[in-house]
Amino acid sequence: MESAAVNAPDSFCFYVMINIENISISFGNLTLFRGLDLQVHYGEGVCICGGSGSGKSSLLKAVLGFVPLSEGTIKVDGTLLAPRTADHIRKKIAWIPQELALPSEWVSEMVRMPFELKANREAGFSKERLMDYFVSLGLEEKLYDKRVNEVSGGQRQRIMLAVTALLDKPLLVVDEPTSALDPESCLRVINFFKSLCSKGMTILSVSHDKQFAAGCDKVFTL
């Protein structure tokens, strides 16, 4: 894995949020990668890049405990990822997959659904904070009262980023956060993530978007 420090944050913290040591992931006879090492520090925004089939999304899912390791270890916030600790670790993580399932008919219902989960009830829903995030991401407040099918793919993507940030988890893991966005909206996401990181959130993402990757603190290429 190649790494490059792109924009080291001013308040760089040397405490490690994600520590990946010598991991290998295989599916049958297919080995995605072997002997991979990666550290993500508190308050960093880190992007994983690589070609299709390089294992980017599988690496994110391994951090979440959804994909088993063939070798090596992963620690999240100092806790070794294992079957008995996976649920505890996931409570610290906000996760946005590339394919978003939006079952609600109304945006106003959709944005409240994550807060009904037992693991997220302590966060508490705040429409005022959500609207602040909407503005930061270039979203009009009137979208809150729209039907989900009236909202574009790029708007849905940014709405979910705003809602997930509102959960106040220490770690955000997101797959292709700007895949449906134009350059202007991508820049808003970059600045939004920088703001979250400056407040102590750690962000691990996967992206093919060179503009987005260039705005991250570190880029790792598989």
Question: Where in this protein do the model-derived segments appear?
Answer:
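Conserved ABC ATPase "signature" region
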Residues: 125-143
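Conserved ABC ATPase signature
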Residues: 147-151, 155
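Conserved structural motif at the start of ABC-family nucleotide-binding domains
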Residues: 18, 33-35
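ABC ATPase C-loop
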Residues: 164-165
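Q-loop/switch helix immediately C-terminal to the Walker
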Residues: 105-120
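Helix-to-loop junction immediately C-terminal to a conserved catalytic motif
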Residues: 64
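Catalytic Walker B motif of ABC-type/P-loop ATPase nucleotide-binding domains
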Residues: 172-176
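Conserved ABC transporter NBD signature motif
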Residues: 72-80, 89
